[in-house]
Amino acid sequence: MTLKQLKYLLGVVDNGLNITSAADRLYTSQPGISKQLRQLEREIGVTIFSRKGKSLVALTPAGQTIVQLARKITRDVENIRSLGKELTAEQEGTLSIATTHTQARYVLPEILSQFHERYPNVKLELHQGTSEQIAALVAENKVDFAIATESRELFPELNLLPCFDWDRIVLTPQDHVLAADADCLTLARLAEHPLVTYVFSSNRESSFLKAFADENLEPKVVFTARDADVIKTYVRMGMGVGVIAPMALLCDDLKDLNARCAKGLFPTVTTWLGFPRDKVLRQYMKEFIALFAPHWPDYLIEQAATAESQEIVDKLAEDLDLPTRTGCTKGLAVAA
């Protein structure tokens, strides 16, 4: 068994069992991958794939277990490489982050600018997507960190560090009926209007939908997007009432939009940073955490980096005073 065989195995799985696509991604040939997979199956004496002719149609039960072990082995190999790099080239490397548009557009620019000043030789990679897409990148071992809000159930293999809280805001055109009578903003009134919000808010497990469900209300979500700028555009068009993160509200937006803090209508949500539980964090990775979540002292970051369960991380975070991100919402009225 070789690392190349495991790499080919994971490449095929991560490309939907399409050997041609995997070969293109791995810069090798389709026959070469097929040969290596057959050799791997013969060596371990187990059928990894169910086949129909020359096509792979599914992983066998044994194959599913083997893929899980292969991912762990490749992560362990990467950890060994990271340790070697840490000892020989502490100021060089790559930091790969998967996150949402809101974090990438409104939160990370200042932090990544500071990080780049400290580590100019560290290459930065930023992947944007939904929580589900971020989870897929994590599962494929393609990123160092995941940054998202809610959706913790999608990341059972990560240690998740709570970083900051935020409360949703409600956006309308300035001539909207809710803007004229903002003092009486309630979930019941919101449910009377078409709503425009984030894709993840349409997940049945989201605190957004649960808030309405707790009041036996059915919101009229007519449009969802990953991008807060897109949501604001459609609010301006009159498609619906927007519900977005406060970090995405710019002061210029208030020239033609009415904004109302929805604290009390919806639960406060927490943005977290996560990394694989068995990952060796290089020093520059720990320093990024310190920049993104400065309320986490260095000694707690060290403990979180080696914590064997999320319960341990949650215990470490118990006494932390999480900051609240407000963007340009300071001074906005709060919903009644």
Label every model-predicted segment.
Residues 159-200, 268-278, 293-297:
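Hydrophobic/proline-rich hinge and linker segments of small-molecule sensing/allosteric domains
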Residues 12-29:
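Short helix-boundary/capping micro-motifs
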Residues 155-162, 166, 229-278:
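Beta-alpha-beta core module
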Residues 246-254, 264-336:
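C-terminal effector-binding regulatory domain of bacterial HTH transcription factors
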Residues 179-180, 185, 194-215, 281-290, ...:
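Secondary-structure junction motif
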Residues 87, 110-114, 132-168, 172, ...:
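Short beta-strand-centered segments that line the small-molecule binding cleft or hinge
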Residues 92-154, 224-225:
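Central regulatory/effector-binding core of bacterial HTH transcription factors
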Residues 41-61:
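A short LG(V/I)-centered, amphipathic sequence patch enriched
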